[in-house]
Curated annotation (Swiss-Prot):
It is a peripheral membrane protein. Keywords: Cell inner membrane, Cell membrane, Membrane, NAD, Quinone, Translocase, Transport, Ubiquinone. NCBIfam families: NuoD (TIGR01962), PRK06075.1 (NF004739). It comes from the Bacteria. It is found in: Cell inner membrane. The lineage of its organism: Bacteria, Pseudomonadati, Pseudomonadota, Betaproteobacteria, Burkholderiales. This is NADH-quinone oxidoreductase subunit D. It catalyses: a quinone + NADH + 5 H(+)(in) = a quinol + NAD(+) + 4 H(+)(out). NDH-1 is composed of 14 different subunits. Subunits NuoB, C, D, E, F, and G constitute the peripheral sector of the complex.
Amino acid sequence: MADIKNYTLNFGPQHPAAHGVLRLVLELDGEVIQRADPHIGLLHRATEKLAEQKSWIQNVPYMDRLDYVSMMSNEHAYVMAIERLLGIEVPIRAQYIRVMFDEITRLLNHLMWIGAHALDVGAMAVFLYAFREREDMFDMYEAVSGARMHAAYYRPGGVYRDLPDTMPQYRASKVHNERAIKVMNEARSGSLLDFIEDFTNRFPKYVDEYETLLTDNRIWKQRLVDIGVVSPERALQMGFTGPMLRGSGIAWDLRKKQPYEVYDKMDFDVPVGVGGDCYARYLVRVEEMRQSNRIIKQCIEWLRRNPGPVITDNHKVAPPSRVDMKSNMEELIHHFKLFTEGMHVPEGEAYAAVEHPKGEFGIYAISDGANKPYRLKIRAPGFPHLAALDEMAKGHMIADAVTIIGTQDIVFGEIDR
């Protein structure tokens, strides 16, 4: 029999485990990876350049479409950068709403990650469970913004509107009979806060279900333990952030180290992994879901007790209320200018970073005093993680490449921008 020679394999961009449009050129020795070369750019939409043509406010929906699994976290960094340039204060209630939705977004992201990661490795049930929970969180997005995914809910100076007092109800259809609808609408009888609170009470039990299926599962551990090991020093050198850095044993979290909004008032822990392998990163993200649930509960408690404005009263930045606009000439002028020309942001530059579900998501905005950005640089957390794929996959089997891509939690919207 002839000796097995080195050969090259194209992985993706149509592979179900490629998480989008990853094209990976693998150089193999038998079934062992010698080199993994990621080819990016297949989802490049020139977001940074498009942002230079649109007004500051028109760019908010573009942010949703970067990492399209963690929509509101992207918006948050962008509006924070604008607020730093403008030097405006955000009402405290709006800050709590933002923090609450940041954590709901973290749950959305981590549920997508655990479902897809498990499916890649061969466990299908977790995927179905995770999407059951995501459905409830899409309803939360829809209640505040009208959109299930691309919310465009955050605004410079606050949020688009306050939390609604009612939730949409399901109606009987060919798919669900009256009895099923009654069960589905049980949690939807009150306000959005009631609905979110009901979800946070149920959620720890769901995380226990995922852990029952995976954490001590022999096959899961065989596929994840000692795969894609990254030392703490190497993780820092390669620019890792978020769960990828914490999985390697470094307790770095922007919510604790550089608190923004009201994170300094929140009581939560930062999970840190031991070992720096795929299993450590899995445990970190699972614990992060529990901590996010804690933060959401604290926000609900505060928001119930403290009504107030949810957007700045500076009408050069945020539109006046419809009542004021229709009864006051000055407010009408503000409204007209905002929705035609847009606001003018003072000359300067600002960098704002948030602890995005995937790591540090940063926006570096430069203004020349016009109504649109002079330059917008997006710091995507997934980019350095994907750049490390070659180093993490070297010496592993082809099947392990899928596990490593899964543990990196790659989304190409933000990498290709």
